[in-house]
Amino acid sequence: NKEAVSIAYRGNIVDLLERLVERNINIELGSDQTSLHNPWAGGYYPAGISLEQANKMISNNPNQFKKEVKKTLVRHTNAINTLCEKGMYFFDYGNAFLLEASRSGADILNQKGDFKYPSYVQDIMGPMCFDYGFGPFRWVCSSNNPKDLEITDRITTEVLENIMSTSPEEIKLQMNDNINWIKAARENKMVVGSESRILYADAEGRMKIAEAFNN
């Protein structure tokens, strides 16, 4: 019926992935967004241990906690590998999952010694944005006046719409996304702290928006 359904699982994802493998349930798309850039201080929790037990172990027995994390990363990788063999597309979110899995001795490298799976920057965001020069572009209203930010939103929208009218087909979708983002930013209260914006813009967009602000 084309209804979008989101289900939150409260637990350790490794237990869930292993159960999916056990029950032969195929998954189309997978990733990991744990904070594995900080694996030893709560960025990644081992399976088979409660949250309370794990937090105590971090303080009282950090070496054992590291061992448990590494064991879980091996299990995690094995489950991902099995699901990918059945057709799942897995990508790294840029959170050091591939790196820490390899350090833990998991089966995460191919025959050439490279990671088996791509990062989302390399495989998804690259072809969509970065390969065409799109990247984070920020501006801040030093007045901290919401009305000034509204003016910059209006100017940015006008500039992007003008650019989009002559843009090649390859970037029209990104340009349209940027316009929708700016138009909806105020309504969705995207400001945290200073009156500022962030936008994925290419070189032409950055220059023309900045010039329009100054004019």
Where are these regions (language model features)?
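Domain-level detector for long C-terminal conserved domains
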Residues: G48-I49, E68
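Long, well-ordered, tryptophan-enriched scaffold segments
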Residues: N38-G43, A47-G48
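Terminal or standalone catalytic/regulatory effector modules within metabolic enzymes
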Residues: G133-N215
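Phosphate/diphosphate-binding loops
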Residues: N1-H37, N55-F90, G94-E169
